[in-house]
């Protein structure tokens, strides 16, 4: 069977992207830079734009010239060292042979995905991530597949997982934590404007770019929900909000809870409700049994308290996350350079 691109690897009906805001949040002054090599990766498709993820991302109306289209195969890439291993496959450093563009190539085994029954989760991850363009969201440039494997062409984040850096340093200081909070709030504002809830924000799902800038990855648990209301249990135990544990309908405010949990973990070194048993963790989350060690500054405590509210409607809105005095005082966010206007 020949390798294909831009048709889903399983017999699901195709869906078009739901309409959303095309502008980025106000604090992001420009889109993530698009290099000529990235344009090549994004534009190779066999169908019309706006159909399925992986198809033409950059429109001709933006001033970029037409690029000849053809499908990718594994032979288009030089495969380098492994970047990570998972239950369903591996991620490799790779280089596209013609453009020499460096990417992360995620190689997934169909047999494992089918065995675990997560075809829909993967399809959702591809469909959502392919339509997101923000400096703090890991890009999915394209994908293709063959009889045994599915290949996702992802942006390469040179500094790897935030989780690994946290393990090395044990905790982060105020400046680094506040910077991550601003980056995360900006990226989630963009996602929520497009009716996308991530639902699984945690250090393992956050990568770091060359300058240490945050990159949200792993949209496997995320959902494109036009109503922004769901009732599915998902996410990571220590990061689950009360409404999900209690089986209540939830909305985009679950991501606000996750920001609060993440901020605590970065400053303290462990999640706020971590306990010896799952039941005890559940109990502490539902009661919002929040305790701070003396090392956490009062400004950070106030920030976390305002996010970790049992009632979702009382949580600090995303717009106020970046505007919180503690974040404004300590954040040192660096925006990416301007994107090129056209391909030479």
Curated annotation (Swiss-Prot):
Activity is greatly increased when AURKB is within the CPC complex. In particular, AURKB-phosphorylated INCENP acts as an activator of AURKB. Positive feedback between HASPIN and AURKB contributes to CPC localization. The active site is at residue 200. It is found in: Nucleus; Chromosome; Chromosome, Centromere; Chromosome, Centromere, Kinetochore. Residues 46-65 are annotated as: Disordered. The phosphorylation of Thr-232 requires the binding to INCENP and occurs by means of an autophosphorylation mechanism. Thr-232 phosphorylation is indispensable for the AURKB kinase activity. The modification Phosphothreonine is found at residues 35, 64, 232. Pfam families: Pkinase (PF00069). Keywords: Acetylation, ATP-binding, Cell cycle, Cell division, Centromere, Chromosome, Cytoplasm, Cytoskeleton, Kinase, Kinetochore, Mitosis, Nucleotide-binding, Nucleus, Phosphoprotein, Serine/threonine-protein kinase, Transferase, Ubl conjugation. One of its GO terms (molecular function) is protein serine/threonine kinase activity. The keyword Nucleus applies. One of its GO terms (biological process) is positive regulation of cytokinesis. It catalyses: L-seryl-[protein] + ATP = O-phospho-L-seryl-[protein] + ADP + H(+); L-threonyl-[protein] + ATP = O-phospho-L-threonyl-[protein] + ADP + H(+). Its EC number is 2.7.11.1. GO terms for cellular component: centrosome; chromosome; chromosome passenger complex; chromosome, centromeric region; contractile ring; cytoplasm; germinal vesicle; kinetochore. ATP binds at residues 83-91, 106. Belongs to the protein kinase superfamily. Ser/Thr protein kinase family. Aurora subfamily. Serine/threonine-protein kinase component of the chromosomal passenger complex (CPC), a complex that acts as a key regulator of mitosis. The CPC complex has essential functions at the centromere in ensuring correct chromosome alignment and segregation and is required for chromatin-induced microtubule stabilization and spindle assembly. Involved in the bipolar attachment of spindle microtubules to kinetochores and is a key regulator for the onset of cytokinesis during mitosis. Required for central/midzone spindle assembly and cleavage furrow formation. This is Aurora kinase B. It comes from Bos taurus (Bovine). The gene is AURKB.
